[in-house]
């Protein structure tokens, strides 16, 4: 599945291929690293390309637009949700950090991120943008995402969260027979 988002600020192209190797290129090194990490643990590959057409801020538009495009491509890939497990969760320790992530692909966007992150940037990525990235991804993928991360090293907390989110998504999209809802429909 692919999605292209072009605004005055950014150009983002996402092409998702299950089981392939991910090629990620963004102008923000830490964002590139986190998207590669998320896709690897989700069992997804393909291509994510982002460019900043004009510099307006600290990367906010690039980070947000990558999450929007990735969420829309995921929504297309998941389809009508009639044959997926729907729920997935994972716990990931990474040195001092520990992250839990849970995903519901029931079609209702919601997000919770509980992680104390300092107001600093790592590799051009302002850490206060992480909850916004999750919100944008959840909204466009029509998913509920809960992430809880703790630890001393903020890099490790955010990376463990991306690993856990990828693993949770991999579980949620695993094959299932029939619609996973007592209502009989996921919309």
Curated annotation (Swiss-Prot):
The organism's taxonomy opens as: Archaea, Thermoproteota, Thermoprotei, Thermoproteales, Thermoproteaceae
| Family annotation (SUPFAM superfamilies) | Ribosomal protein S5 domain 2-like
Q: Which family does it belong to?
A: Belongs to the imidazoleglycerol-phosphate dehydratase family.
GO cellular component terms listed in the entry, alphabetical order:
cytoplasm
Does the keyword Transferase belong to this entry? no
**Does the entry feature the keyword Disulfide bond, yes or no?**
no
Alphabetically, the GO molecular function entries are: imidazoleglycerol-phosphate dehydratase activity
What reaction gets catalysed by this protein?
D-erythro-1-(imidazol-4-yl)glycerol 3-phosphate = 3-(imidazol-4-yl)-2-oxopropyl phosphate + H2O
The name under which this protein is listed is Imidazoleglycerol-phosphate dehydratase
Matching InterPro entries:
IGPD_sf (IPR038494), ImidazoleglycerolP_deHydtase (IPR000807), ImidazoleglycerP_deHydtase_CS (IPR020565), Ribosomal_Su5_D2-typ_SF (IPR020568)
The pathway it acts in is: Amino-acid biosynthesis; L-histidine biosynthesis; L-histidine from 5-phospho-alpha-D-ribose 1-diphosphate: step 6/9
Q: Please provide the Gene Ontology terms (biological process) for this protein.
A: L-histidine biosynthetic process
**What general EC class does the enzyme of this chain belong to?**
lyase
Q: Which residues form the signal peptide?
A: none
Q: Which gene encodes it?
A: hisB
Origin species: Pyrobaculum calidifontis (strain DSM 21063 / JCM 11548 / VA1)
Which keywords does the record carry? Answer: Amino-acid biosynthesis, Cytoplasm, Histidine biosynthesis, Lyase
Q: Recorded E.C. number(s)?
A: 4.2.1.19
Q: Where in the cell is it found?
A: Cytoplasm
């Amino acid at each position: 599945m692919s999605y292209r988002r072009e605004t005055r600020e950014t150009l983002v192209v996402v092409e998702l291929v299950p089981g392939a190797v991910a090629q990620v290129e963004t102008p923000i090194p830490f964002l590139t690293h986190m998207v590669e990490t998320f896709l690897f643990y989700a069992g997804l590959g393909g291509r994510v390309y982002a460019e900043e057409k004009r510099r307006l801020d600290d990367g906010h538009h690039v980070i947000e637009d990558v999450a929007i495009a990735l969420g829309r491509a995921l929504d297309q890939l998941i389809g009508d949700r009639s044959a997926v497990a729907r729920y997935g969760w994972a716990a990931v320790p990474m040195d001092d950090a520990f992250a839990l992530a849970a995903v519901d692909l029931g079609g209702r966007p919601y997000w919770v991120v509980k992680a104390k992150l300092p107001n600093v940037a790592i590799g051009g990525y302002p850490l206060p943008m992480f909850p916004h990235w999750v919100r944008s991804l959840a909204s466009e993928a029509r998913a509920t995402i809960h992430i809880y991360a703790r630890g001393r090293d903020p890099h490790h907390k955010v990376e463990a969260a991306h690993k856990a989110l990828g693993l949770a998504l991999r579980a949620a999209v695993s094959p299932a027979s029939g619609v996973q809802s007592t209502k009989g429909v996921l919309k």
